[in-house]
């Protein structure tokens, strides 16, 4: 295996580390941790207290599972961040606006389906990159790497935080995507471009929802999501659970359709962690733009030549009666 391979980057899961993760995976925030400090401490602060306690109690050496991120917490790094709620609400409002002001309902539905497939793949690549302990101290993505990797240590953090927290975790990447696609690629004035970009953002938020629900106990899982999981439209707990066992599979968090091809590439075809990082950067800055270049002529043919527009408008009208 070449130097800088992904298999070398991610330490093996030892029996001791797997037992430690399993011990914490179904636990609520410990009462002792919740009471440490101000009694009115919110969930983000309580999780950070728990992270510090776990780091302080863990004895390891370089190469051990989770050693790098635990060491960073010991050195004072903060894992879970307070997000800017107004910014997230602005993103939500703009996403709805961008979809509703697209060329047509049929165009928006097509864009939603295409970006739904794309975001599952993009999320898997992002997951591979942010799971890499060698990237913990890289500029721009280091903080996200720390939070991603600590999710392996405290998997329940995604269920004890409400969905607003999970959605707001995307503030940075959503801002970057909107900045690139709306400003650099003329999406501010092009309703078709804007609609596709906003559909991609909507699917990114759906990915956060799917990830959170995959961690929920069956009795607490939303019944609509449970149906979508059964239909294969949202990632199932079984698929995502495989990721938490070995960390070398189960990377997608939206539908999971890309799990098999991405896992094959990760294990056998693309060994270099730097190639995955390059793919992540390329998709972040050019993925949606490339998708739009692919979709626009396809949509024009389907709507004008294929007669999809009238069919979808007829379906929408009948469904409202």
Positions of PLM-derived features:
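Interfacial helix-loop-helix junctions of multi-pass membrane proteins
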Residues: 214, 218-225, 249
């Amino acid at each position: 295996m070449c130097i800088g391979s992904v298999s070398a980057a991610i330490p093996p899961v030892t029996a001791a580390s797997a037992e430690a993760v399993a011990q914490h995976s179904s636990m609520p925030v410990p009462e002792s941790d919740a009471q440490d400090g101000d009694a009115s401490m919110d969930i983000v602060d309580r999780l950070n207290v728990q992270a510090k306690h776990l780091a302080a109690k863990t004895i390891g050496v370089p190469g051990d599972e989770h050693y790098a991120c635990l060491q960073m917490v010991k050195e004072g790094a903060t894992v879970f961040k307070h997000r800017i709620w107004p910014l997230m609400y602005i993103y939500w409002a703009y996403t709805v606006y961008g979809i509703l002001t697209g060329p047509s309902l049929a165009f928006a539905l097509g864009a939603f389906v295409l970006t739904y497939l794309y975001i599952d793949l993009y999320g898997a690549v992002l997951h591979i990159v942010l799971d890499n302990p060698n990237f913990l101290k890289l500029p721009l993505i280091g903080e996200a790497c720390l939070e991603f990797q600590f999710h392996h240590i405290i998997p329940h953090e995604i269920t004890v935080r409400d969905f607003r927290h999970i959605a707001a975790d995307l503030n940075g990447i959503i801002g970057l995507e909107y900045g690139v696609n709306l400003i650099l690629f003329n999406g501010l004035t092009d309703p078709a471009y804007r609609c596709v970009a906003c559909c991609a953002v909507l699917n990114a938020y759906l990915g956060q929802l799917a990830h959170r629900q995959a961690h929920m106990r069956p009795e607490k899982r939303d019944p609509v999501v449970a149906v979508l999981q059964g239909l294969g439209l949202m990632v199932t707990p079984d698929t995502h659970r495989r990721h938490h066992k070995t960390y070398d599979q189960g990377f997608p968090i939206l539908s999971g359709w890309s799990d098999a091809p991405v896992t094959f590439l990760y294990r056998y075809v693309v060994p270099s962690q730097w190639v995955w990082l390059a793919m992540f950067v390329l998709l972040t800055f050019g993925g949606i733009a490339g998708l739009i270049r692919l979709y626009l002529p396809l949509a024009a043919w389907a709507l004008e030549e294929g007669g999809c527009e009238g069919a979808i408008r007829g379906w929408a009208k009948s469904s409202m009666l």
